[in-house]
Amino acid sequence: MSGLIGRKIGMTSIFDENGKNIPCTVIEAGPCVVTQVRTIGVDGYEALQLGFDDKNEKHSTKADLGHFKKAGTVAKKKVVEFQDFVSEHKLGDVISVDLFSEGEFVDIQGVSKGKGFQGVVKRHGFGGVGQATHGQHNRLRAPGSVGASSYPSRVFKGMRMAGRMGGDNVKVQNLRVLKVVAEKNLLVIKGCIPGCNNSYVIIQK
């Protein structure tokens, strides 16, 4: 498995050779620095730790500064491990968007937009209770019954109710890479990806 850390720029659309309008997402992918190399002998597994997006030194702890100094780079805001990286890299190597090529498929992981406290109609797609007429006046978006009566005298775990929506780790799989703009470290991905603009995403292939 290989991958990069990126930042979601936003959505746009492009036209293909047949004149079809395709919605797509632009991602600033890398460059990422190898900040640590995990080995089986020391750590029990193989992985590369990549860092992305420079961090102000005054906002970093001494432990962070020492960790990134070993890799010969400044402190990074986002650090992610990629296990079983396909190609060999050493500490301090820079991995760029050239890792990807046009036409291949990638998986993208991010944190979905937070929606706050929402009801069951928006959060779970409930249809509401009853109809809008014939005396009904306050149950249009109600959840309805949440359990039985005296037996089992409780609400089962996992019952879908109102609550906080969004802000979850979401992975979208098999998204096609439409364009790779190497000189600007940009990836153009077909379709939408989780997260708001300027949020961090993990791109895997």
Curated annotation (Swiss-Prot):
GO annotation, biological process: translation
One term of GO molecular function: structural constituent of ribosome
Top-level taxon of origin: Bacteria
Residues forming coiled coils: none
Keyword set, alphabetical order: Ribonucleoprotein, Ribosomal protein, RNA-binding, rRNA-binding
Pfam families reported in the protein's UniProt record: Ribosomal_L3 (PF00297)
Keyword presence, Isomerase: no
Record GO cellular component, one term: ribonucleoprotein complex
Function of the molecule: One of the primary rRNA binding proteins, it binds directly near the 3'-end of the 23S rRNA, where it nucleates assembly of the 50S subunit.
NCBIfam families: L3_bact
Assembly and binders: Part of the 50S ribosomal subunit. Forms a cluster with proteins L14 and L19.
Family membership: Belongs to the universal ribosomal protein uL3 family.
Protein name: Large ribosomal subunit protein uL3
Organism this protein belongs to: Flavobacterium psychrophilum (strain ATCC 49511 / DSM 21280 / CIP 103535 / JIP02/86)
Gene that specifies this protein: rplC
